[in-house]
Structure formats: structure tokens, C-alpha cells
């Protein structure tokens, strides 16, 4: 058995699509008894639906730049959370320097933290948006995003 690991954005997923050629190569690789792994900065909620729309899935997901690992079905096998107070301190700091909106990946979704102007430069926030007043409600933080 062999294992192939691929990045997602701009590697397997180019111009917002997975080519038929790449999909077939992955499926043939897996049918030959090999493992296919995706390693990405994305969270499961923003990437798994894309694979579902193409009708295939990696054998393992390495997510949030390694902070989370899940099996083929999305069952979490490993998570390294950012201590809550540390994450909140970083997010408050970003707000204080007129950040244009940060993103926060939780174990189950990504939320966009709106700037004081009510804007966000973040993409793919499947968990919606929150304001600085709602920061205290965040838990299970695995990654902080800033553009």
C-alpha cells in the first residue's frame, strides 16, 4: 500500500473545479489499494461538500494546516485546539489594529469576525459572521485566519 498526499486549493482544485482527469487518477489510485490524503488549510465544513459534489472522497483529511485530522467520513481523529484565552486575545488584538475582519475555524465550521466597520475579507465562512461582542461565544478554536 502506498499513500499520496495532495494540497487542495490551486493543486487539485484549480479554478474552482477538480478536473475529470484528476478525479479519475485519484479513484484509480484508491481502487489499486492505495491511500489518498488531502492536506489543506481549510476546515472540513468548507471542503467536504466539494468532494461530495464530485462523488469521491480522500481516505484521510488533514485540515486547518494540521490542527485537525479526520477519517474519510469526517470523524475527527485528532484535534489541537488553540487555548480559548489565547485565541480570544489574538482576535481582540486584531480588532484593535483595525483588522479588516478575521476568520476563525472551529472544529465544525469557520466563522467570519466582522471588523468594526462591519466588513470581512474572509472567504468561505460556512458558519456565518459574528461581531466582536460575540467573541466570548466561541469555543473549540483550531485556527485563526487573517488576510
Where do the language-model regions lie?
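HAD-like small-molecule phosphatases
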Residues: 51, 67-147
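Short, structured coil segments at secondary-structure junctions
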Residues: 54-57, 65
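Asp-based phosphoryl-transfer active-site loop
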Residues: 2-16, 90
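Short, flexible loop segments at the rims of nucleotide/cofactor-binding pockets, characterized by
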Residues: 13-16, 39, 122-123
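Short, acidic loop-to-helix structural element flanking the phosphoryl-transfer center
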Residues: 16-34, 79-88
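Substrate-recognition element of Asp-dependent hydrolases with the DxDx(T/V) motif
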Residues: 26-49, 65, 104-108, 143-147
Amino acid at each position: 500500500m502506498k499513500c499520496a498526499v495532495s494540497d487542495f486549493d490551486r493543486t487539485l482544485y484549480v479554478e474552482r473545479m477538480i478536473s475529470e482527469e484528476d478525479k479519475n487518477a485519484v479513484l484509480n489510485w484508491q481502487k489499486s489499494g492505495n491511500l489518498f490524503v488531502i492536506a489543506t488549510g481549510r476546515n472540513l465544513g468548507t471542503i467536504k461538500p466539494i468532494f461530495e459534489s464530485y462523488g469521491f472522497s480522500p481516505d484521510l483529511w488533514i485540515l486547518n494546516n494540521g490542527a485537525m485530522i479526520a477519517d474519510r467520513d469526517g470523524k475527527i481523529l485528532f484535534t489541537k485546539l488553540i487555548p480559548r484565552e489565547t485565541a480570544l486575545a489574538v482576535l481582540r488584538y486584531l480588532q484593535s489594529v483595525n483588522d479588516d475582519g478575521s476568520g476563525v475555524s472551529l472544529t465544525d465550521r469557520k466563522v467570519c469576525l466582522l471588523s468594526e466597520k462591519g466588513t470581512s475579507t474572509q472567504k468561505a465562512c460556512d458558519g456565518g459572521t459574528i461581531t466582536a461582542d460575540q467573541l466570548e461565544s466561541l469555543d473549540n478554536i483550531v485556527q485563526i485566519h487573517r488576510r
